[in-house]
């Protein structure tokens, strides 16, 4: 039995690993740069999950938990209107940790939607409907905020895109993020 609940600060290490998996390791290495490792990037993301003022904050995260209290999946989401303020901690952290300035990064969302930043199910728990459960819980969060729910999907990930369409997301426009072409999908309020 899986339960969906709000994340806890103590879960930051595992949440960070799943955020990195959602981003993909090539993208994480791009952010870390050639002089730093994925472990260095994991340390940064873990510190951001532990904070309350970060886009990756545990406060913005729900987790799928097994009967044995293992984290089977995560979904990180926040009000798109808060992107710039929440992303500033990532920008500051990357500058301090890697000497890289990402202040000119494209905006992946904007005001008017609950934005799903990261969705990932641990590989040992895939194909059990957990991603759909996490999406549905996040869509409900958006309804309570009176916001449609949006996300970006990599154009090279048709399997994820099919899942999003099955849940009711529709293509809004295109975007580029982390060096990848992405589709902006949105699930409207009903």
Mark where each language-model region is:
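Conserved catalytic-core motifs of GNAT/GCN5-like acyltransferases
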Residues: 80-81, 150-152, 165-184
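Conserved GNAT-fold acetyl-CoA-binding loop/helix
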Residues: 26-49, 95
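Conserved N-terminal entry element of GNAT/NAT acetyltransferase domains
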Residues: 1-10, 27-30, 190
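Conserved acetyl-CoA-binding loop-helix of GNAT-fold acetyltransferases
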Residues: 127-140, 165-166
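Conserved GNAT acetyl-CoA-binding A-motif
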Residues: 112-114, 142-154
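A short helix-loop-beta-strand connector motif used in the catalytic cores of GNAT acetyltransferases and
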Residues: 48-63, 81-85, 115
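Conserved beta-strand in the GNAT
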Residues: 63, 70-79, 115, 120
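Conserved acyl-donor/pantetheine-binding loop and adjacent beta-alpha core of acyl/acetyltransferases
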Residues: 78-114, 118
């Amino acid at each position: 039995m899986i339960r969906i609940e709000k994340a806890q600060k103590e879960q930051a290490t595992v949440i960070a690993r799943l955020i990195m998996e959602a981003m993909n390791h090539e993208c994480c290495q791009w952010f870390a740069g050639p002089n730093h490792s994925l472990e260095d990037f994991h340390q940064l993301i873990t510190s951001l999950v532990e904070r309350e003022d970060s886009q990756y904050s545990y406060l913005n995260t729900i987790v799928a938990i097994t009967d044995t209290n293992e984290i089977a999946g995560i979904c990180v989401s926040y009000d798109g209107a808060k992107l710039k303020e929440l992303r500033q901690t990532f920008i500051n952290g990357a500058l301090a940790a890697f000497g890289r300035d990402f202040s000119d990064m494209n905006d992946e969302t904007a005001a008017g939607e609950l934005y799903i930043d990261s969705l990932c199910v641990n590989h040992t728990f895939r194909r059990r409907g957990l991603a759909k459960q996490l999406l549905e819980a996040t869509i409900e969060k958006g309804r309570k905020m009176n916001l449609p729910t949006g996300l970006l999907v990599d154009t090279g990930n048709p399997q994820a895109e099919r899942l999003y369409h099955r849940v009711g997301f529709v293509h809004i426009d295109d975007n580029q993020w982390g060096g990848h072409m992405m589709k902006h999908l949105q699930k409207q309020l009903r």
